[in-house]
């Protein structure tokens, strides 16, 4: 990998939006700043001039001014990185960069670090003793590193396990010992004492039985000098301080990017070549551990497993430049002693910590190979956002002082290559940015792409390694020195150990336990986990836990993570995490710092060190307001747009849904499946669609400006879905700080089944865009989360179920509407009469009959129109309806009824016949009520039309293109026209003719039938029966609704009754709750309803009573109210009116009630929108009662528009006034006239025409001679009053006295409805209806025609009270003194044949003149006649 080119530093900064910061500026940072040792932008902390570049730098001896008592802040960094080091400029052999991409000196060991390679005693280390050198160096570096609170690398990532001979338990035990040792050295004296024993142990590391003898890989004689900073010798410390002054870590960081010479080492090259094949998975993320907060930082810098032959020390003081020869073996694990409080103050001092580190047992050391770090696409990446990773890591280490530094992670097996990112929000973040910018590349836990570099850079917070680094003893502040070693283990993992000695300055930051706790509270960290399994990342205090996926982790880590997570969830106000869009940074008290690398860390308010607070710096450079936008951002945006706008090369996936699942599975499946609106893929199950949104293709991190949080998406569809959610609210998604990284294979597969599949996500049941409520400790989905996007949050897999398809929910039981007339149905112990299934309640039985289950032959074609039935039980019960067989089971509710009331129950209570067949468009999911409608819709809205060349297979979408093709390619076809072809949108079949396409639609639409319900009172269609029933309750039967008009107006609720006709079909409305319906279907439905209405008019009285009882009287206007004549009060109910009359006026006469009933119950409504005038052909109607008679057609004046007579109390509509009067008399118990009044009928009553209605006879005045005195009695005893027929209205005459009096002198033609007040004109009109062949007999009173004389005679007697021969004797209406004039008795008295008017006393010679005159009196005569008072 030596030939791999390292990306230019400027390019790296540009790629991750990290502002370019000059190295000098980084060096000039105040020593008290936690991250002063690092360049804010990844630049070195010291001037490049301070460090010698080239081979000579490796030979430089450490500064003699280094004080052995100084307490340098040394950070031990273990990096599992995907880094491509550049080959050394001067050497032919490609050597790892002196500086790793995380900003540390590469394992190639550059000599530019001005540190002598001699032993602590001043002597040069032998080549064979290189193993001891790294050990001591690691000790020194680790101790110093733990003191460095500002170091962003305060978190150490254990990527590899120990040697085969060392178990994890042993490692943990050793860690505890190290922690105890560090605690002992917290005081200055203990630190000095500890240095001496540390040296021998470090020196004897080579002889350790656990590790094989060191194999010198570097030829440079100054091997010892490179490791001397980590050695525990006091002399080393003095040398280190001087060396650091000349060549601090910053220099090493800057060199690889600034083009400073890098040392070439054959040993590095050889080690790399040997292990290159064995390292398929290089660390994907930079693991940094720092114990600034904990008094007992971990002592182990890093231990990785590698082949014994190429063993090198895993850790090297970061401040020390490493020469090829001096490169220590990986087996040497430096131990660091805890930093003393004074050392914390002097965190910038670079004095070497000679005796602080306690050498670890050799058994714990694993031989490791020093190799170049290389990019490996296979390295696993934790499946959680970077911001969330730090929390869990901090959680592990900060739960307890010992746990913070526990080396369990370091001792893990190499397979556990998941990398932890502990991001401390200390002020050292800026300084760490420089190193992280370079090393963040490998740092990305989830992505092994260079963008990870910016992760650490932006995170910029130092973290504690799991016992890898320990703060060293006290020493005078010195320039910062860094020693970096890159190690490749036998398992293929790469470990980088960095030992750094801080320069002079305040005490080491974050060295105390309290500071470590502060880190836990102030940052979000990931929990370590297995390679493929993610653990939940606990978020900082006030921060919601933000894991992206679950990782399998050690029990100790999980325990620590769970503690922090519980703590976080209890304290956090917002704990919402989107399945596909994971909130990465949620601000607590400080603004969110979205890290480009995926980790966003908020800086802590202050870190306490020795009781003091350290100033905090932004956790991420992205968080700073003045961040410089990288010049490569535009290219990144272009790549992002390309991803979003690129066309999917694969065809859209559509499952084969031709065979539905078995009904017992209960899997409701749409005809076209569940479709992703972003890419067009469809899935058979809703769970599959949820998985589709949760798939992991790449990692896209953006800061959503609308959500005000950092979000991570793992595929394009989830990002577009999030943007769609904003669009639905009228917003355009705006995002910033874009970061894109690939994901590893381990992340792409296998992470979705970490939770039981059968468990349902709590947010699935909620409507889109509503947040789900989850119990404490779990991570609820954000309000912007879509139900299909919800995915299990890492770490909460055990508590929060993964998204899954919702099981088929039983439909809500729709109980029958109340029906007073109908009898209660029998439910035999709530047992289904069809399948004998037993239920516990009526609601369950009703639900059983209404639940939709796949059933063959569920469509009944015998019904007109056809209907679909929900299940087999309903089908069986429905089929018996057609066969008229018992038991009469309602297909809707399962109840058993008597045959007499069964039909009423079906029509009025359960609305069974409201079922229809609808069709759902597979493309837009719109439901249509008719086959032709949906076919037309699909063809016009979705099907593609192409214009095909008649001479070749080419087809074009436009006629112009096709014609241009013909002209250019086929010039011979001069008059040829492109042929239109039609492509089916559902199967891509092409047809040359549209009728063939329509026929083809039938094959698809047969599978797209859905249940729809049509309101029986109007033409509205509903997809749910419950919606239809609510509509009926509110619009047609509600108490708050005015007296309902016939269902023919455009609005059944508000249309006045006076403007409608008998045709019960409202104008078509496109309401939101309606389903689409074709015009032809509407007419068909209207005709059906009209026919049903006609039948209802002829139904028995029982049905009419049912209608009356069901409908609640609610007047619409004054004409429909009960009005008191005395006080002019109005009452909506008849009972209220009667009570008022009795209580207020003391009497309620039947005659007065009769008149009021006629006024209240009878009103005429016309279907046409505009009412015709009341005068036609000069005939003016002046009706005393409020009954509109505008029946005449406005155009012809001869035909009527199916007028309907409306009963306001029963809300029934009748086509004939006679039927309405009968209904009022029979159903409401009111008669117009009493028998006592009828005795005077021959002298006082004048016949008037009945209202409109086919077959009803007119109520013309009987002009035949006066009957005998007993005529009135005959009128009362007319037989056959109950006969029915077109011209035989039952007991019509008794209902007409009031009507006759109000319509005095009006003659109406029954066949056509023509009305006139002129008898002669009426006689001239009626012959036009006479049929000489079929019905030669015509009644001159009303114009009705009959086939036989007997029928005519019976009609005259029943309808007009004319006996045989009377009609002949009285040819004109005025010839009968009995009926023709109220003064007929006086006419006889006159003797001269003259007649006089009883109202005004005028005398006339002819009865016809009297009849004409009498019409001028109107109600005056009626009033006089009723009260028997002379006028």
Curated annotation (Swiss-Prot):
Stretch list, region Disordered: 24-481, 504-538, 754-816, 1041-1120, 1225-1310, 1362-1392
InterPro entries recorded: Zn532-like, Znf-C2H2_11, Znf_C2H2_sf, Znf_C2H2_type
Single GO cellular component term: nucleus
Compartments where found: Nucleus
Bias-annotated ranges (Basic and acidic residues): 361-377, 438-449
GO molecular function: DNA binding; zinc ion binding
Residue spans, zinc finger C2H2-type: 674-692, 830-853, 919-942, 947-970, 982-1004, 1013-1036, 1122-1145, 1205-1227, 1307-1329, 1337-1360, 1395-1425
Bias-annotated ranges (Gly residues): 519-528
Pfam families (UniProt xref): zf-C2H2, zf-C2H2_11, zf-C2H2_ZNF592
SMART domains: ZnF_C2H2
Keywords in alphabetical order: DNA-binding, Metal-binding, Nucleus, Repeat, Transcription, Transcription regulation, Zinc, Zinc-finger
Protein origin, superkingdom: Eukaryota
Low complexity compositional bias, start-end: 61-73, 174-188, 196-209, 217-248, 311-324, 385-410, 760-775, 1043-1057
Annotated Polar residues bias: 103-122, 249-267, 342-359, 781-802, 1058-1075, 1373-1384
Tissue localization of expression: Widely expressed with highest levels in eye, spleen and ovary.
Biased segments, Acidic residues type: 1080-1111
Chain's role: May be involved in transcriptional regulation.
PANTHER family xref list: ZINC FINGER PROTEIN 532-RELATED, ZINC FINGER PROTEIN 687
Family label: Belongs to the krueppel C2H2-type zinc-finger protein family.
Protein name: Zinc finger protein 687b
Organism of this sequence: Danio rerio
Gene: znf687b
């Amino acid at each position: 990998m030596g030939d791999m080119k390292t990306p230019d530093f400027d390019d790296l900064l540009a790629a991750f939006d990290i502002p370019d910061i000059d190295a000098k500026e980084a060096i000039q940072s105040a020593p008290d700043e936690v991250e002063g040792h690092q360049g804010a932008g990844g630049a070195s902390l010291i001037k490049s001039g301070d460090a010698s570049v080239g081979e000579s730098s490796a030979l430089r001896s450490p500064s003699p001014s280094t004080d052995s008592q100084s307490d340098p802040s040394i950070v031990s960094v273990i990096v599992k990185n995907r880094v491509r080091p550049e080959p050394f400029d001067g050497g032919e052999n490609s050597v790892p960069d002196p500086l790793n991409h995380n900003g540390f000196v590469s394992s190639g060991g550059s000599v530019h670090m001005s540190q002598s390679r001699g032993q602590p005693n001043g002597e040069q280390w032998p080549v064979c003793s290189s193993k001891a050198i790294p050990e001591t160096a690691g000790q020194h570096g680790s101790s110093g590193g733990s003191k460095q609170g500002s170091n962003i690398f305060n978190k150490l990532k254990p990527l590899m396990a120990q040697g085969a001979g060392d178990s994890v338990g042993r490692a943990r035990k050793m860690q505890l010992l190290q922690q105890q040792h560090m605690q002992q050295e917290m005081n200055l004296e203990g630190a000095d004492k500890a240095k001496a024993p540390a040296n021998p142990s470090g020196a004897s590391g080579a002889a350790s039985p656990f590790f094989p003898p060191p194999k010198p890989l570097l030829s440079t004689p100054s091997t010892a000098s490179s490791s001397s900073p980590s050695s525990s010798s006091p002399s080393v410390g003095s040398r280190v301080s001087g060396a650091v002054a000349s060549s601090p870590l910053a220099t090493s960081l800057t060199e690889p990017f600034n083009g400073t010479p890098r040392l070439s080492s054959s040993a590095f090259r050889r080690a790399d070549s040997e292990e290159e094949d064995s390292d398929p998975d290089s660390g994907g993320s930079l693991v940094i551990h720092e114990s600034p907060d904990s008094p007992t930082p971990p002592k182990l810098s890093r231990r990785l497993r590698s082949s014994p032959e190429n063993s090198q020390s895993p850790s090297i003081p970061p401040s020390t430049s490493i020469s090829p020869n001096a490169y220590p073996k990986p087996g040497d694990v430096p131990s660091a002693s805890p930093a003393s409080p004074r050392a914390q103050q002097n965190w910038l001092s670079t004095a070497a910590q000679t005796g602080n580190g306690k050498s670890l047992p050799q058994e714990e050391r694993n031989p490791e190979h020093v190799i170049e770090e290389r990019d490996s696409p296979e390295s696993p990446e934790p499946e959680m956002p970077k911001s969330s990773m730090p929390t869990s890591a901090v959680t592990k280490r900060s739960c307890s002082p010992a746990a913070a530094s526990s080396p369990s992670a370091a001792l893990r097996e190499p397979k556990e290559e998941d990398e932890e990112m502990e991001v401390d929000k200390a002020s050292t973040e800026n300084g760490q940015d420089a190193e992280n910018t370079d090393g963040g590349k490998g740092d990305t836990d989830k992505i092994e792409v260079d963008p990870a570099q910016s992760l650490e850079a932006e995170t910029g917070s130092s973290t504690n390694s799991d016992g890898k680094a320990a703060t060293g003893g006290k020493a005078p502040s010195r320039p910062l020195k860094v020693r970096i070693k890159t190690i490749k283990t036998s398992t293929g993992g790469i470990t980088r150990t960095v030992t750094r000695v801080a320069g002079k300055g305040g005490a080491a930051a974050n060295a105390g336990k309290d500071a470590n706790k502060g880190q836990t509270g102030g940052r979000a960290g990931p929990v370590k986990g297995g390679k493929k399994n993610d653990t939940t990342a606990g978020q900082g205090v006030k921060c919601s836990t933000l894991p992206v996926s679950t990782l399998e982790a050690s029990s100790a880590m999980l325990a620590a993570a769970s503690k922090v997570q519980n703590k976080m969830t209890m304290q956090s106000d917002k704990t919402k995490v989107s399945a596909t869009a994971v909130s990465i940074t949620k601000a607590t008290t400080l603004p969110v710092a979205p890290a480009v690398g995926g980790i966003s860390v908020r800086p802590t308010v202050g870190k306490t060190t020795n009781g003091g607070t350290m100033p905090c710096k932004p956790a991420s450079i992205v968080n700073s307001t003045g961040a410089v936008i990288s010049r490569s951002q535009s290219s990144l945006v272009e790549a992002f747009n390309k991803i979003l706008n690129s066309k999917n090369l694969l065809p859209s996936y559509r499952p084969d849904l031709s065979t539905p699942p078995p009904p017992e599975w209960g899997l409701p499946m749409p005809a076209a499946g569940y479709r992703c609106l972003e890419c067009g893929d469809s899935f058979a199950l809703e769970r599959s669609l949820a998985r589709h949104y949760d798939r992991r293709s790449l990692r896209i991190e953006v800061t959503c400006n609308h959500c005000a949080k950092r979000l991570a998406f793992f595929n394009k569809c989830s990002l577009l879905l999030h943007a769609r959610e904003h669009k639905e609210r009228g917003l355009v998604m705006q995002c910033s700080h874009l970061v894109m990284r690939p994901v590893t294979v381990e992340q792409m597969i296998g992470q979705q089944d970490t939770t039981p599949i059968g468990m349902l996500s709590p947010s699935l049941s909620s409507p889109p865009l509503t947040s789900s409520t989850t119990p404490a400790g779990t991570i609820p989905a954000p309000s912007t989360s879509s139900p299909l996007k919800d995915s299990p949050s890492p770490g909460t897999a055990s508590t929060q179920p993964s998204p899954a398809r919702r099981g088929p929910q039983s439909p809500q039981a729709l109980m029958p509407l109340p029906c007073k007339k109908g009898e209660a149905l029998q439910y035999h112990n709530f047992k289904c009469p069809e399948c004998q299934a037993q239920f516990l309640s009526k609601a369950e039985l009703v639900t059983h009959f209404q639940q939709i289950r796949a059933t063959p032959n569920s469509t009944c074609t015998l019904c007109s129109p056809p209907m679909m039935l929900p299940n087999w039980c309903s089908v069986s019960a429905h089929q018996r309806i057609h066969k008229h067989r018992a038991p009469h089971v309602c297909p809707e509710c399962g109840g058993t009824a008597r045959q007499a009331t069964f039909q009423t129950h079906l029509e009025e209570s359960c609305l069974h016949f409201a079922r229809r067949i609808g069709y759902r468009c597979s493309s837009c999911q719109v439901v249509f009520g008719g086959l032709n409608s949906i076919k037309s819709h699909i063809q016009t809205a979705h099907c593609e039309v192409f214009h095909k060349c008649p001479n070749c297979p080419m087809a074009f979408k436009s006629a112009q293109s096709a014609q241009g093709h013909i002209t250019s390619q086929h010039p011979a076809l001069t008059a040829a026209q492109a042929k239109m072809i039609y492509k089916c949108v559902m199967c891509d079949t092409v047809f040359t003719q549209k009728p063939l396409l329509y026929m083809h639609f039938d094959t698809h639409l047969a599978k797209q039938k859905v249940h729809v319900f049509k309101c029986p009172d109007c033409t509205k269609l509903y997809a749910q029966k419950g919606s239809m029933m609510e509509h009926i309750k509110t619009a047609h039967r509600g108490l708050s609704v005015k007296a309902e008009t016939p269902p023919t107006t455009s609005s059944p609720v508000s249309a006045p009754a006076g403007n409608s006709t008998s045709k019960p079909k409202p104008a078509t409305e496109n309401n939101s709750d309606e389903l689409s319906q074709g015009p032809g279907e509407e007419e068909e439905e209207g005709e059906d309803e009209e026919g049903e209405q006609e039948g209802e008019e002829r139904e028995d009285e029982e049905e009419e009573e049912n209608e009356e009882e069901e409908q609640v009287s609610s007047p619409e206007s004054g004409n429909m109210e009960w009005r008191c004549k005395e006080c002019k009060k109005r009452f909506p109910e008849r009972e209220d009116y009667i009570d008022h009359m009795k209580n207020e006026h003391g009497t309620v006469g039947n005659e007065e009630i009769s008149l009021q009933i006629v006024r209240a119950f009878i009103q005429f409504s016309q279907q046409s929108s505009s009412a015709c005038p009341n005068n036609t052909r000069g005939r003016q109607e002046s009706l005393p009662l409020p009954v509109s008679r505008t029946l005449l057609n406005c155009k012809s004046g001869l035909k009527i528009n199916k007028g309907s007579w409306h009963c306001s109390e029963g809300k029934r509509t009748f086509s004939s006034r006679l039927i309405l009067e009968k209904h009022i008399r029979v159903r409401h118990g009111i008669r117009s006239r009493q028998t006592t009044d009828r005795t005077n009928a021959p002298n006082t009553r004048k016949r008037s025409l009945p209202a409109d209605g086919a077959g009803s006879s007119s109520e013309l005045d009987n002009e035949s001679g006066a009957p005998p005195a007993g005529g009135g009695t005959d009128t009362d005893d007319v037989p056959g009053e109950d006969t029915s027929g077109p011209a035989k209205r039952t007991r019509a005459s008794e209902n007409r006295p009031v009507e006759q009096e109000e319509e005095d002198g009006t003659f109406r033609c029954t066949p056509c409805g023509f009305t006139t007040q002129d008898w002669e004109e009426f006689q001239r009109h009626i012959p036009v209806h006479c049929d000489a062949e079929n019905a030669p007999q015509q009644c001159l009173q009303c114009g009705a025609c009959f086939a036989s004389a007997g029928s005519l005679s019976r009609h005259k007697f029943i309808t007009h009270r004319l006996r045989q021969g009377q009609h002949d004797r009285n040819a004109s209406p005025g010839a009968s003194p009995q009926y023709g004039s109220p003064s007929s008795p006086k006419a006889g008295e006159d003797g001269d044949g003259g007649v006089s008017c009883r109202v005004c006393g005028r005398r006339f010679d002819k009865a016809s003149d009297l009849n004409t005159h009498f019409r001028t009196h109107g109600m005056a005569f009626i009033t006089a006649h009723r009260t028997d008072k002379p006028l």
